[in-house]
Design a protein with these regions (language model features):
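Repetitive beta-architecture junctions, highlighting loop-to-beta-strand starts
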Residues: 38-39, 98-102, 163-165, 222-224
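Multi-bladed beta-propeller domains
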Residues: 2-14, 43-61, 103-122, 169-194, ...
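Conserved beta-strand position repeated across blades of beta-propeller domains
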Residues: 20-22, 66, 127, 197, ...
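Short, conserved, GDST-rich strand-edge loop motifs in beta-rich repeat architectures
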Residues: 76-97, 138-161, 208-220
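Residue-level detector of Asp-centered blade-edge/turn motifs that repeat once per structural unit
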Residues: 23-25, 69-70, 130-131, 200-201, ...
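Loop/turn-rich, solvent-exposed surfaces of beta-rich toroidal or solenoidal domains
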Residues: 190-229, 239-262
């Protein structure tokens, strides 16, 4: 990890994160810079450019990204994010979104448009299917009882956040999305599903499942599950899970390997 604090201070320090590549290649990629002179750097056909994805109609700049596999498009979540620090719980840190939506960035036209922005839903973690014709994402129903003190209420009710996995069809020619379809209903079992990842052959959905929230890397109860999208059967991957957190998983380009953070 680059120790940038060795050559900077609290005024000009930076966090560089959320690297994302197009279809396992290296010509097109993006990463975010936080703090001083922050923004998103997009490398398009080998040319790097810094962009500001925040508009008057979005919550924030782009956060969690997913490149379209063939087109110059990136789906992002936009998030108003905070942290809570617990003294009694064994999970000492919780990362929480008070609001979140899904947007689409058209690189060639430098245009941002909303994909899903429902006031009572916390939409996050978009991910394209390998054929580029479906966008998967997570969303949790959350209705504030106090319309003013959102941050305080989220800290009090953070265990109420239960994400399901959804998808929308996508027309690559017209760049339009279809209706939202439920793929995996975690909330019915009072659980939360995050980080949908589709295998390169398009058959399997890999995701993390935990008790609540969207930041399962901090949650010891989070495990990796897989759904066969042909018959919609879901099972826990017993041989790769432990009694600690499993999350932030990815497929290899040939679909024969899975990498998991534990």
């Amino acid at each position: 990890i680059y120790g940038n604090m060795l050559v900077s201070n609290d005024l000009n320090g930076q966090c560089i994160n959320c690297h994302s590549y197009q279809n396992y290649g290296t010509n097109n990629m993006q990463f975010h810079m936080r703090q001083a002179m922050g923004g998103t750097v997009i490398v398009n056909d080998g040319v790097a450019k810094k962009v500001n994805l925040k508009t008057d109609s979005t919550l924030s700049a782009g956060v969690y990204p997913s490149w379209h596999p063939t087109l110059k498009l990136i789906a992002y979540s936009t998030n108003l994010t905070g942290q809570a620090f617990h003294t009694k719980s064994s999970a000492k840190i919780d990362v929480q979104d008070t609001k979140s939506d899904i947007i689409l960035y058209d690189i060639e036209n430098n245009e941002v448009s909303n994909i899903s922005a429902i006031d009572t839903e916390l939409e996050v973690f978009p991910w394209w299917a390998p054929d580029g014709k479906t966008l998967y994402f997570c969303s949790a129903f959350f209705e504030y009882k106090d319309t003013v003190a959102n941050e305080t209420e989220m800290i009090d009710r953070y265990t109420d956040v239960k994400h399901n996995i959804y998808r929308k069809s996508f027309d690559p020619q017209n760049k339009t999305f279809g209706e939202t379809e439920l793929v995996f209903d975690a909330a019915k079992d009072s659980l939360s599903a995050t980080l949908p990842r589709i295998s390169p052959d398009g058959r399997y959905l890999l995701f993390a499942l935990g008790e609540h929230g969207c930041f399962h890397i901090w949650h010891a109860d989070a495990d990796i599950y897989i759904t066969d999208l042909q018959n919609m059967q879901t099972r826990k991957l017993e041989n790769i899970n432990s009694d600690q957190a499993e999350s932030y998983h990815s497929w290899s380009s040939n679909g024969r390997w899975i990498i998991v953070s534990s």
